[in-house]
């Protein structure tokens, strides 16, 4: 078998998105990739909802987007986090008035210069928080219908800034309804907001997502390799510097060892493009040369839609890799076969 894949071969075998069995774990570590992958659909819903203030509910249903995911988009854009949602729940009865006849809570708001009234269908409820709304962690991947609670929260996040109570519970942030149907403004507003959010959260998320990616590969390798093979995350090998007499410990995402034989493995799974793959590509030639000088081997597990957008970097890695595979179990099994072939030679 030819383990030295071309870019085209690797992409053909790639899965591009996180495997289903990891989706809950990944969602718990970071909701950002989920938001970005559904961003175009979210933008389309806002663009198509400019005729009347509650048209958005019809569009949400037609788009078949989960209500909690749509709400999460609004929460992120409004920067209306968990503490504010809790505060809204606790102060709801003090913030919004009630109908004299029915005692229902309501909200007077403005849409395109006209006054409207929304009667709350579910709020207030006890213990309003992110968990009840299923917008945090692994709950974000659950499919939730557009219930009365979601309708109430969506209306607040869209139009809260236009109410008389805008200065209470952070409602001044809830302004997205003012741009519904305004296509160019929507696109600029959302992309700028997500760029800001991405900068804040992506660094923190990259490490945890990288650990998830490495652990998954380790688990599958351990399943396919003999028990007397050592499979270690963040393993180090003492390698000679080819330009001097010095030796340094070089880290690999995963290190597989048996007797005096070693395979260093680098793992990169990026749904959204970033510079990690460029860094690995820049090191690829030197790392392979140093490993080969000790009669060791280097392999790469490369996947994710973001990585394949940086084709030059992936091509460089393929050129200086002894075995390159994608991220599915069947692909990692190919890597296991490569390791056994080398160790048994």
Curated annotation (Swiss-Prot):
Transferase found in the keyword field: no
Domain of life: Bacteria
Catalytic activity: Endonucleolytic cleavage of DNA to give specific double-stranded fragments with terminal 5'-phosphates
UniProt entry keywords in alphabetical sequence: Endonuclease, Hydrolase, Nuclease, Restriction system
Covalent S-S links between cysteines: none
Enzyme class label: hydrolase
EC code: 3.1.21.4
UniProt-recorded Gene Ontology molecular function terms: type II site-specific deoxyribonuclease activity
One GO BP annotation of this record: DNA restriction-modification system
Protein name: Type II restriction enzyme HgiCI
Organism: Herpetosiphon aurantiacus
């Amino acid at each position: 078998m030819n383990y030295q894949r071309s870019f085209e071969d690797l992409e053909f075998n790639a899965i591009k998105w996180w495997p289903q069995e990891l989706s809950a774990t990944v969602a718990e570590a970071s909701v950002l990739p989920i938001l970005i992958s559904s961003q175009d659909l979210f933008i389309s819903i806002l663009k198509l909802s400019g005729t009347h203030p509650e048209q958005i509910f019809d569009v949400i249903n037609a788009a078949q987007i989960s209500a909690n995911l749509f709400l999460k988009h609004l929460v992120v854009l409004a920067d209306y986090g968990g503490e504010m949602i809790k505060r809204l729940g606790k102060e709801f009865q003090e913030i919004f008035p009630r109908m004299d006849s029915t005692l229902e809570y309501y909200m007077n708001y403005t849409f395109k210069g006209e006054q409207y009234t929304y009667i709350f269908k579910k709020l207030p409820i006890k213990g309003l928080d992110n968990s009840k709304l299923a917008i945090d962690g692994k709950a974000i991947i659950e499919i939730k219908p557009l219930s009365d609670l979601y309708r109430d929260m969506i209306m607040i996040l869209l139009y809260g800034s236009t109410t008389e109570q805008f200065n209470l519970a952070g409602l001044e942030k809830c302004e997205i309804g003012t741009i519904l149907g305004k296509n160019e403004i929507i696109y600029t507003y959302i992309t700028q907001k997500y760029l800001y959010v991405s900068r804040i959260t992506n660094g923190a998320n990259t490490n945890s997502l990288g650990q998830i990616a490495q652990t998954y590969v380790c688990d599958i390798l351990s399943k396919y390799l003999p028990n007397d093979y050592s499979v270690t995350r963040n393993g180090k090998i003492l390698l000679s510097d080819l330009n001097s007499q010095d030796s340094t410990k070089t880290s690999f995402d995963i290190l597989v060892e048996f007797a005096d034989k070693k395979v260093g493995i680098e793992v990169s799974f990026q749904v959204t493009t970033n510079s990690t793959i460029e860094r690995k590509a820049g090191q690829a030639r030197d790392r392979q040369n140093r490993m080969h000088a000790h009669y060791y081997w280097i392999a790469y597990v490369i996947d994710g839609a973001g990585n394949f957008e940086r084709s030059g970097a992936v091509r460089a890695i393929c050129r200086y890799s002894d075995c390159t595979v994608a991220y599915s179990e069947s692909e990692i099994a190919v890597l296991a076969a490569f390791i056994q072939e080398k160790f048994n030679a």
